[in-house]
């Protein structure tokens, strides 16, 4: 199905976490009323009464005329032309469960950097298979863009990924802002998997820091992670792509180094000696790399690509292996 986004297309956002909130902020700043599915009663009440999300980015105040928060998923989706998914991947099915309105006449944009657990599918694959959308009706908004900086107007670079360049440009127009720069790509597979893999690699960096490894080693670890990511993409889905640009390498770097990185934080706790269970309990937000490590290992069983860093993270998270021992063994496999 050929789908063309119109100039007056209306947007709706599914989710109420930090990235969803930052996205709504960008859309609302363009003087377009944004539909917003918020299933948490406390958050919904606060958004309706004072224009703030009390749980995430609560210093961001919305003009209440620019947002239309609702707990009625069908109504939010029905009134939109572009539906933007911004939930943790582990909760996507739960968020969409109440939906009875068909998505087949919508354009769906995933802002999720994770795999749907249990289904072992990327969000793009899941929406295609379960909701009957053509891949030409599905896009991505991604890049090295922590919500905390985007919401505060820090210069950020986003990549819109879409099969149709005109649709990509239309999506970009809705996110446009003084401090937002855009690039465009048609590599749905590569960009989405890069955004998933970088979370696993950020976990490995956090573990290394927690164990006491220094900057010299981190540089080697991240360089090898970049190579491992490229190898996975080239061997699992060969295509002409430059993995040195921001949607691939840039997103990897910011997730590995940033103080805002949830995945680095989870790894840091484990490296400091926390059990995986206690580290997860201490996290206040979802670290996508935890779910991705298991999913990527399952997916890679088909491809049999050499991925020593991802394998190390999986062993620590799911096999109860010693982080110190696994990291030591990994050091001999890096170049």
Identify what each model region corresponds to.
Residues 63, 69, 73-78, 82-153, ...:
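Rossmann-like NAD(P)(H) cofactor-binding subdomain of soluble oxidoreductases
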Residues 155-158, 189-234, 245-265:
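Active-site-proximal catalytic alpha-helix in oxidoreductases
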Residues 1-60, 66-71:
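NAD(P)+-binding Rossmann beta1-loop-alpha1 motif at the extreme N-terminus of oxidoreductases
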Residues 115-215:
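Rossmann-fold dinucleotide-binding core
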């Amino acid at each position: 199905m050929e789908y063309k986004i119109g100039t007056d297309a209306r947007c709706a956002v599914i989710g109420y976490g930090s990235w969803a909130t930052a996205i709504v902020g960008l859309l609302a700043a363009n003087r377009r009323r944004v539909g917003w599915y918020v299933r948490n009663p406390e958050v919904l009440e606060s958004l309706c009464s004072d224009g703030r999300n009390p749980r995430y980015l609560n210093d961001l105040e919305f003009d209440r005329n620019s947002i239309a928060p609702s707990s009625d998923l069908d109504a939010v989706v029905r009134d939109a032309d572009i539906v933007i998914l911004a939930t943790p991947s582990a909760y996507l099915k739960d968020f969409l469960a109440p939906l009875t309105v068909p998505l087949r006449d919508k354009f769906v944009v995933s802002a999720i950097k994770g795999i749907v657990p249990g289904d072992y599918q990327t969000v793009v694959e899941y929406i295609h298979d379960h909701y009957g959308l053509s891949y030409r009706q599905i896009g991505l908004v991604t890049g090295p863009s922590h919500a905390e900086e985007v919401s505060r107007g820090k210069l950020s670079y986003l990549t819109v990924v879409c099969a149709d360049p005109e649709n990509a440009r239309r999506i970009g127009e809705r996110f446009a802002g003084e401090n937002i720069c855009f690039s465009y790509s048609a590599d749905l597979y590569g960009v989405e998997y890069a955004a998933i893999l970088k979370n696993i690699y950020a976990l490995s960096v956090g573990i290394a820091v927690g164990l006491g490894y220094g900057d010299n080693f981190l540089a080697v670890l991240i360089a090898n992670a970049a190579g491992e990511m490229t190898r996975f993409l080239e061997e699992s889905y060969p295509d002409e792509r430059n993995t040195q640009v921001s949607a691939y390498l840039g997103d990897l770097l910011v997730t590995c180094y940033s103080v805002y990185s949830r995945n680095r934080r989870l790894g840091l706790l484990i490296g400091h000696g926390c059990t995986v269970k206690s580290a997860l309990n201490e996290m206040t937000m979802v670290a996508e790399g935890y779910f991705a490590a298991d999913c990527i290992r399952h997916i890679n069983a088909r491809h049999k690509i050499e991925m020593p860093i991802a394998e190390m993270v999986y062993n620590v998270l799911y096999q109860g292996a010693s982080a110190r021992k696994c990291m030591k063994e990994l050091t001999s496999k890096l170049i």
